Amino acid sequence: MEGSFQSRLQSIIQRTGETTAESTNSWYNRLRTSMPWSNDYTEIPTNASGGNSYFQSSEFSLSRWERYMLFGICLLGSLACYAIACFMFPVLVLKPRKFVLLWTMGSLLAVLGFAIVQGFVAHFRQLTTMERLPITLSYFVTLLATIIATIKIKSTILSIVFGVLHILSFVAYLIAFFPFGTRTVSLGTRMASRSLSNWLP
């Protein structure tokens, strides 16, 4: 009698646990499928061999939505660093290290943003392709030249020159690596020229 009661009690507990687990899983699945990025869950490539990656942990699995969000944060941070550095330029002689720190942080955040959205190895490959290698070299060379002119040479004129060149390289970098950047610029140029031709007599 006692053994029969225990077996019935165990079966009831087991059925209750299975029901709770099923309801929890169904609730979690409904919540996950309701998210806008539920069908876009991908893993950032971290190795040239494709499927085999250096990092197998879940921290390197990001959805497309999450990658775009991090890209936007890095790009806004980069623009903010450049803007603050430009405003600090009048006090460059007094605080050159802060200027260089902001300038370098802005450059690194821009590169990091594109590396996140494209994948680190994929972005490095794009940086070293023949058609984009001049932009890559000009971007990092002008960055290094700005730092040297500010810290080592301590020349305001050279800092301005290399800083302007680096800003131009940064714009070229955005156009080259931003999704549909070249097409957007060409379309904007055509629209601007068409509007200008309509305004001119």
UniProtKB/Swiss-Prot annotation:
Listed GO CC annotations: cytosol; fungal-type vacuole membrane; Golgi apparatus; Golgi membrane
Segments on the Cytoplasmic side according to the record's topology features: 1-68, 120-132, 181-201
UniProt superkingdom: Eukaryota
Gene Ontology BP, a term: intracellular protein transport
Membrane topology: Multi-pass membrane protein
Location(s) in or outside the cell: Golgi apparatus membrane
Main location per the UniProt record: Golgi
UniProt xrefs under InterPro entries: Vesicle_transpt_Got1/SFT2, Vesicle_transpt_SFT2
Keyword Ubl conjugation included in the entry's annotation: no
Keywords: Golgi apparatus, Membrane, Protein transport, Transmembrane, Transmembrane helix, Transport
Chain ranges on the Lumenal side, renumbered to this chain: 90-98, 154-159
Transmembrane intervals: 69-89, 99-119, 133-153, 160-180
Keyword Protein transport applies: yes
PANTHER family given in the database record: VESICLE TRANSPORT PROTEIN SFT2C, VESICLE TRANSPORT PROTEIN-RELATED
UniProt family annotation: Belongs to the SFT2 family.
Function as written in the Swiss-Prot or TrEMBL entry: Nonessential protein required for the fusion of transport vesicles derived from the endocytic pathway with the Golgi complex. Can be replaced by got1.
Protein name, entry field: Protein transport protein sft2
